[in-house]
Curated annotation (Swiss-Prot):
Protein name per its UniProtKB record: DNA-directed RNA polymerase subunit beta''
GO biological process, one term: DNA-templated transcription
Subcellular location as annotated: Plastid
Function: DNA-dependent RNA polymerase catalyzes the transcription of DNA into RNA using the four ribonucleoside triphosphates as substrates.
Top-level enzyme category: transferase
Gene3D superfamilies tied to this protein: 1.10.132.30, 1.10.150.390, 1.10.1790.20, RNA polymerase Rpb1, domain 3
Provenance organism: Aneura mirabilis (Parasitic liverwort)
UniProt gene name: rpoC2
Length: 1376
């Protein structure tokens, strides 16, 4: 025994793998008995320490990964980008789903890796961490769901739910996440109950197919083997694959033999291989054993129980079946915890080693599209790629069929992904149909890419010929499903609501529309019939016994009212302008009154200077339309812009010095540079000419005029010129050329020579359309609009002083309301409308215009009492039927499809909500700041009484930037009715207020109303709520944006052009909504709103071009292939699919492709005969290895280690049958018959004409039913059929396997004492004695395909030939 001082002490954690290595080392060096005695001691120690430690799992042990927060945010950011590209029409719905799956699966995998790293750093002895690597009931996947994220789930149909579960069980799931998680949990519970029996049945089938495999020989003499392609970066995998194997050939290093053939590989041998060689190592395998019915000792290798060569006579087949089937039962118990969770593989990427420019030959690549919709290039063959950096060049080789994600000559950064490598084995795929549904009513349209002719008559199914966009253009269809002919109107006719459209042939169904509310008005004095008005009209009539007055309320839904502190602004969606509301006189506007102002941010000054007018024209005030506001009259009468043009600012820098002139360090008319000291404390921040002047308060002011001093050659002629503005491109003194506008100023000092000072000038351009009109109600017969008037705030030649840190506006824009007097009276009422829903509320401006219809002049001054109730209700009828005619519910323009020739044509009504008007003017951005001071008035816009309070605030507000407005919908407006009101006719207008159930509401009230009205709100549950009345804060919501001068070269979309979302016109800042241009005006565009859908090649369109579409209709069916998604319940269905070799399995596909590839390669080198033979043999070997790797991959994903040799025994039995072809001898076997490979080899050795056969891959069930023993087949399944066929054929069971001997009660042919084993050993000893007396050479590695004899020294006698033929004939006769 060694001295204690010489003992080696290892202070490290012993995990399961390390303990297994110690056990193997002990058994190798000391034997099983000593190793058992040593291992009893750590076992006892382990139980003692586990009892003392009492390791248990608590909720505090569940530690969340710190990196989860930013990983989730990054994934959500990528999801938002995918959603934007999908809305733009750049992605298919399938590509969007793929991006989402790839993003969240990658996030989940990174989170899982971070979880293991976090446990290993912070708390390695954490019970949760130890459980994940214990190999018992827990694994990394289960722990990841406890502390990481549950991830994507699969529904019962196997479809992936596109809403990932971001939470884990430690944090708790939300309601939505819990419902989604129940899909997988329910699937897990079902699998726990059902898959347990499947696991047991799988074990039975595995044992059934290999039960006769017994070790009978020491060496079969084969020279074949399999190659172990190893990567020394994963030493653990190399140890598991090589230890216990036997070498198939010698291993050489530099002509030195490192290991001999038939030498078993132990730990020391593997260490030599890892340190000295990197070549693939060929080892013997059960799948390449030459034994016909059994297996040899060297092809199997070590026994896993004692670390030595397996004993002859051991039933390794049953051991292999049990070792593969038994883990399936254990894995089934994990189903409940992880059921339904989606798993996949991250694609293998190529990253750049350093920064540089990519260079490759572009002739070998062609453009394509990735599965996520990104542009890429695919290479035909292996592509040589070079990265040219600053100091060195890196060369990379990209495999064939890989996707390049970068362009040629593109600059890349270090570790950037440049290529995606295609997997060698094609993964299993399935064909999926994804349906795209419409989310709005309208009309379907497409241009190219779709087959317009259907395959069948009267069919609306159209396939796509290539990738194209399918548009859904917004519109309202009263003629649902094209059931009625449009007989009264033609295309482009304008109609009003309640207009008869067509004759009714039958009473159509009344579809429900949950979002449509109607208003019923009752008048008990005139008529008992209810009159229904939809809120699309927004025009309501109050009936009484003597007259009728119509009150038209215009709600500016393109704008909303934004409140900043105490000030209200108008905000528009498609231009970045805010307008300050300026409404006076109790909220009453007269014709041509202004109601909102803003200062254009483009025309703001940040530096002092002199203003010079250019081509711009200024007019005087319009005396006929003078405003009643003195403030408005003051600046309107002097500087109103009549015609657009340009004006200029000549900048200058001003400094105010002390009262003493001597304190100024520079003299007058002297040129200074930047940094020159003007006074002792002031330095010049610009270069130019110094001008000193005296102010009124006896202080001296210093101005720096930027420019260059030039002394001309002829000062007399120059003095005749006055100061002028010189445009770009003009020459000065025939020496200089101007690059920009300059202000040429002449300076004449008192005592010095006169000189010229060219000063830079800043040009401002304003559009010629200084006054424009926008009609508020498109497609309505109302001559109502707003004018935009621009005003200059400074006169020509005025010096503008800008205080540091502030901006001075140059132009102010006013919005002026105007209408035709033939329709309305002289007044319009403005009120604030607040529309409140459950989770949101918005403010709008409402303008009430009062006009009269057949009103007697004598009764206009009388009091009119009208009693009516407005009730909110929901109607199911989408259109009204009157006298068998279809009545329109909408007001707009008829759009009739021209794709159908019959009388039943699709019709769409374009209403105001379906269209949008976009100005061609150029917008700009300058949103209001957070520090804006606001104001409001509790009075009815009586600003005259509040000027003293808010004067200073308003001055600051007017110096702010302009603001933008946002388009909103008026679909959520609710109405109230007045039970008893008493008003003057000339001031009569109805009331609309914002609503909120069971709350006190603020009601707008006009001061000219004689009696406060009583308001009642009726909600959707017919509940009546009384609301109190208060004074109204009346605001004007007339929405418009401030125009700016247009630029030359602006590209306007053509008529009929389709615009995608956020389409930006050239050189403008306007982003247009998606839709189609249906009208082009000189000042604006009319766009019909729509939504694009991208359809790939082969997709199916479910409607005709121009056909009407309802919300929820199926539009497109996308057909695509996707990888089969698995879950981590236990991998049992995947293993069963592989072992049964179903047609959906990728192994059969790989065998066929491998055979073709090897056949073509071999024919070029060897010839046809050898090429077919070797390609069939090698393709079968490759198929066997692929199948072994796929089965091993499923079990490794669950942390289960299975020896490859056991899987190879199963795969050998699956590939041991061959299918006879028609070229065979008919007397021996019929075409299509399954025969064993050993039987075919024996027949070909003795027959003159060989049998032609093809390799085939059988499942374990079919392989079990095609053995030589009918007793074994009958005991497995289909007993009656198997026994009946065996009796008819006269088959004889030779009892070669273990199962049939157990059934008949005989001794099983296994074990060291078996007679067959003893006879086989005796025969081997005789062969060894004979071979020792003769020289023998094994020949080359590639054996002769025509040499089928296993023994070379004895020629078969005639009796042996007859026995073999008799046995073969009898076996074939039984199979017929």
């Amino acid at each position: 025994m060694a001295e204690p001082v010489d003992l080696i002490f290892y202070n490290r954690v012993m995990d399961r793998i390390t303990i297994k290595q110690i056990m193997n080392g002990l058994m190798t060096h000391f034997g099983i008995t000593y190793a058992t005695h040593v291992l009893d001691q750590p076992k006892t120690l382990g139980f003692q320490q586990a009892t003392r430690g009492a390791t248990s799992l608590g909720i505090d042990d569940l530690l969340t990964t710190p990196s989860k927060g930013w990983l989730i945010k990054d994934a959500e950011h990528h999801g938002n980008l995918s959603g934007k590209h999908y809305n733009y029409g750049n992605l298919y719905a399938v590509e969007k789903l793929r991006q989402l799956i790839e993003t969240w699966y990658t996030t989940s995998e990174y989170l899982k890796r971070g979880m293991n790293l976090n446990f290993g750093i912070t708390d390695p002895s954490n019970p949760v961490h130890m459980m994940s690597f214990s190999g018992a009931r827990g694994s990394t996947s289960q722990i990841h769901q406890l502390v990481g994220m549950r991830g994507l789930m699969s529904d019962p149909q196997g479809q992936i739910i596109d809403l990932p579960i971001q939470s884990n069980f430690r944090e708790g799931l939300s309601l939505t996440e819990y419902i989604i998680s129940c899909y997988g949990a329910r699937k897990g519970v079902v699998d726990t109950a059902v898959r347990t029996s499947d696991a047991g049945y799988l074990t039975r089938r595995l044992v059934e197919v290999v039960q006769r495999i017994v070790v009978r020989k020491s060496d079969c003499g084969t020279t074949s083997g399999i190659s172990m392609n190893h990567s020394w970066k994963k030493k653990r995998i190399i140890y598991q694959r090589l230890i216990g194997r036997v070498l198939a050939e010698n291993v050489y290093i530099n002509n030195r033999c490192l290991a001999m053939r038939n030498q078993d590989i132990g730990n020391l041998t593997v260490d030599k291989f890892i340190g000295l060689t990197a070549e693939p190592i060929r080892v013997r395998s059960p799948s390449t054993c030459k034994s016909m019915l059994w297996i040899c000792q060297l092809c199997y290798g070590w026994s896993l129980t004692n670390g030595d060569l397996v004993e002859v006579g051991e039933a390794v087949g049953i051991i292999a079946g049990q070792s593969i089937g038994e883990p399936g039962t254990q894995l089934t118990l994990r189903t409940f915890h992880t059921g339904g969770v989606f798993t996949g593989d991250i694609a293998e990427h190529v990253r750049t080693p350093s920064d540089g420019v990519i260079e490759f030959d572009g002739r070998f690549v062609y453009p394509t599209r990735t599965r996520h919709g990104h542009p890429a290039w695919i290479c035909h063959t292996s592509l040589f790629l070079s990265i040219r950096g600053r100091n060195k060049r890196h060369n990379l080789l990209i495999p064939a069929k890989s996707l390049l994600l970068i362009r040629n000559n593109q600059y890349v950064e270090s570790e950037q992904v440049i290529a995606e490598i295609r997997t060698k084995a094609s993964p299993p795929k399935e064909r999926i149909h994804k349906y795209i549904y419409s989310d709005l009513d309208g009309e379907m349209s497409w241009i190219t890419g779709v087959c317009h002719t259907s395959e069948y008559m009267h069919s609306c199914i159209h396939p796509t010929l290539r990738t194209c966009h399918v548009w859904i253009l917004s519109g309202k269809s009263d003629n649902k499903k094209d059931k009625l002919p449009v007989s009264f109107y033609d295309n482009q006719d304008r109609i009003n609501s309640n207009t008869f459209l067509a004759e009714d042939q039958s009473f159509p169904s009344t579809p429900r529309n949950k979002n449509r509310s109607n208003i019923c008005i009752f008048n008990p004095y005139v008529s008992k019939k209810n009159r229904v008005f939809t809120r699309w009209e927004l025009t309501h009539i109050a009936f009484n016994s003597s007259n009728q007055s119509v009150n038209s309320n215009i709600i500016l839904y393109d704008y909303d009212v934004v409140r900043k502190h105490r000030t209200f602004f108008l905000r528009e969606m498609y231009t970045n302008l805010y307008f300050l509301l300026e409404v006076k006189n109790n909220g009453v506007l007269r014709n041509n009154d202004f109601f909102a102002i803003t200062d254009h941010p483009k025309y703001e000054l940040k530096e002092s200077g002199v203003l010079k007018y250019g081509t711009i024209k200024i007019g005087s005030a319009d005396r006929n339309n003078e405003s009643r506001d003195e403030r408005m009259k003051k600046f309107r009468s002097t500087f109103r812009i009549v015609k657009g043009g340009n004006f200029f600012l000549i900048p200058e820098r001003r400094y105010i010095s002390a009262q003493v002139l001597s304190s100024i360090l520079e003299r007058n008319n002297k040129s200074v540079r930047v940094g020159t000291s003007i006074t002792s404390i002031v330095q010049s921040d610009t270069s130019g000419l110094v001008r000193i002047g005296r102010r009124i308060n006896n202080t001296y002011e210093v101005k720096i005029l930027p420019g260059i001093i030039y002394y001309p050659d002829e000062p007399n002629k120059l003095s005749e010129r006055v100061s002028v503005l010189i445009p770009p491109g003009k020459q000065l003194f025939n020496k200089f050329r101007c690059d920009h506008w300059i202000y040429f100023q002449w300076i004449i000092p008192l005592e010095e020579k006169p000189f010229a000072l060219p000063r830079p000038a800043t040009e401002y351009v304003i559009s010629n359309r200084s006054t424009q009109k926008k009609f508020l109600n498109l497609l309505r017969n109302i001559d109502l609009g707003i004018n935009t008037a621009n005003y200059l705030l400074h006169a020509d030649g005025e010096q503008i002083r800008v205080i540091s840190g502030r901006c001075t506006p140059l132009i102010r824009t006013c919005l002026i309301i105007c209408w035709g007097k033939k329709y309305f009276t002289e007044k319009a009422h403005v009120s604030l409308l607040k529309i409140k829903t459950t989770n949101n509320s918005r403010n709008y401006l409402q303008i009430s215009l009062i006009y009269f219809d057949s009103l007697d002049e004598k009764r206009q001054g009388d009091m009119v009492y009208s009693q009516y109730i407005l009730r909110r209700n929901y109607y199911d009828d989408f259109f009204s039927i009157c006298r068998n005619r279809l009545k329109s519910k909408h007001k707009g323009i008829i759009r009739i499809s021209s794709d159908r020739k019959d009388e039943y044509r699709s019709s769409i009504i374009l209403s105001p909500p379906d269209l949008i008007e976009v100005s061609k003017m150029i917008g700009s951005k300058n949103p209001i700041g957070k520090d804006t001071d606001n104001f409001s008035s509790t009075e009815f816009f009586n600003f005259q009484n509040q000027l003293e309070k808010i004067g200073s605030i308003r001055n600051r507000i007017r110096s702010r930037a302009k603001h933008f407005l946002r388009i909103v919908s008026f679909d959520e407006i609710c109405f109230l009715g007045n039970l008893r009101t008493s008003t003057k006719l000339d001031e009569c207008f109805y009331w609309i207020i914002y609503t909120g159930a069971k709350t006190c509401l603020r009601i707008d009230q006009s001061r000219q109303t004689f009696q406060n009205p009583k308001w009642f709100l009726i909600d959707e549950y017919i509940g009546i709520y009384r609301c109190r009345c208060e004074k109204n804060i009346n605001h004007n919501l007339f929405d418009y944006y401030l125009p700016s001068p247009s630029r030359e070269g602006t590209k306007i979309p053509s008529l009929g052009h389709f615009l995608f979302k956020d389409f930006r016109m050239v050189e403008t800042k306007q982003f247009l909504p998606p839709g189609q241009v249906i009208g082009i005006h000189m000042d604006y565009l009319i766009i019909r709103l729509g939504k694009p859908h991208l359809a790939n090649e082969g997709a199916i369109i479910h409607n005709n071009c121009g056909g009407s579409v309802e919300e929820g209709d199926t539009l497109i069916t996308l057909i695509y292939e996707r990888l089969k998604s698995g879950d981590i319940i236990q991998g049992l269905p995947k293993v069963e699919q592989l072992l049964e070799a179903r047609s959906t399995n990728s192994v059969s596909i790989d065998l066929g492709s491998s055979f073709r590839d090897w056949s073509n390669d071999m024919k070029r080198f060897i010839g046809n005969l050898w090429g077919f033979f070797l390609s069939a043999r090698i393709s079968m070997e490759q198929g066997q290895m692929i199948l072994v790797d796929q089965i091993q991959k499923v079990y490794k994903s669950q942390g289960v280690q299975i020896s490859n040799k056991h899987i190879e025994i199963i795969v050998r039995q699956m590939t041991s049958r061959f299918l006879t072809s028609e070229d065979g001898i008919i007397d021996i076997s019929s075409p299509g018959e399954l025969i064993e490979f050993s039987q075919a080899r024996r027949m070909n050795r003795v027959l003159e004409e060989v049998i032609s056969y093809e390799p085939i891959l059988l499942g374990i069930t079919e392989a079990s039913l095609s053995t030589r023993s009918f007793i074994s087949e009958a005991s497995f399944q289909e007993t009656t059929r198997v026994l009946a066929r065996a009796a008819l054929k006269g088959r004889i069971d030779w009892l070669r396997g273990l199962k049939e001997n157990v059934i008949v009660g005989e001794i099983i042919p296994a074990g060291t004492g078996s007679e067959e084993v003893i006879w086989q050993r005796t025969l081997e000893r005789e062969e060894d004695i004979f071979l020792s007396n003769r020289e023998f050479c094994f020949g080359e590695n590639i054996e002769n395909p025509f040499w089928h004899s296993d023994t070379f020294f004895v020629f078969p006698t005639m009796e042996t030939v007859r026995n073999i033929l008799r046995e073969s004939a009898s076996a074939n006769g039984r199979n017929i």
